[in-house]
């Protein structure tokens, strides 16, 4: 991975992190009467992050399954195209 790709990957991570932090904060913090985080707010934020992580994991898993199915379908199409013979590429 090049330096530019690393920087872009890090930027994408920070963007996603900030979006999740903002969403969870807006959903969970409703009162600003104290500097401390209440137990309810902390629990809500933990649940919010947990849901996001599970959703991300599930989407990633489905994407991998989709990619595998596409690869298998493409492999079957190549076999049919070649009359069932697989030609070795050199």
Curated annotation (Swiss-Prot):
Asked whether the keyword Zinc is assigned, the reply is: yes
Disulphide connectivity of cysteines: 24-48, 28-44
Q: Where, by residue number, is the motif Twin CX3C motif?
A: 24-48
Q: Which InterPro entries match?
A: Mito_inner_translocase_sub, Tim10-like, Tim10-like_dom_sf
Q: Name one GO molecular function term.
A: metal ion binding
> What's a GO biological-process term for it?
protein insertion into mitochondrial inner membrane
The organism's place on the tree of life at top rank? Eukaryota
Cell location: Mitochondrion inner membrane
Naming one, the record's GO cellular component terms include: mitochondrial inner membrane
Q: How does it assemble?
A: Heterohexamer; composed of 3 copies of tim-9/tin-9.1 and 3 copies of tim-10/tin-10, named soluble 70 kDa complex. The complex associates with the tim-22 component of the TIM22 complex. Interacts with multi-pass transmembrane proteins in transit.
Record's comment describing the protein's domains: The twin CX3C motif contains 4 conserved Cys residues that form 2 disulfide bonds in the mitochondrial intermembrane space. However, during the transit of tim-9/tin-9.1 from cytoplasm into mitochondrion, the Cys residues probably coordinate zinc, thereby preventing folding and allowing its transfer across mitochondrial outer membrane.
- Protein name in the entry: Mitochondrial import inner membrane translocase subunit Tim9
Natural source organism: Caenorhabditis elegans
Q: Which gene encodes it?
A: tin-9.1
């Amino acid at each position: 991975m090049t330096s530019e790709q690393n920087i872009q990957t890090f930027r994408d991570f920070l963007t996603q992190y900030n979006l999740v932090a903002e969403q969870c904060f807006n959903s969970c913090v409703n009162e600003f009467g104290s500097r401390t985080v209440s137990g309810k707010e902390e629990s809500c934020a933990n649940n919010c992050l947990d849901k996001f992580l599970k959703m991300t994991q599930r989407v990633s898993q489905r994407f991998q399954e989709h990619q595998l199915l596409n690869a298998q379908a493409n492999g079957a199409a190549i076999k049919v195209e070649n009359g069932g013979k697989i030609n070795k590429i050199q």
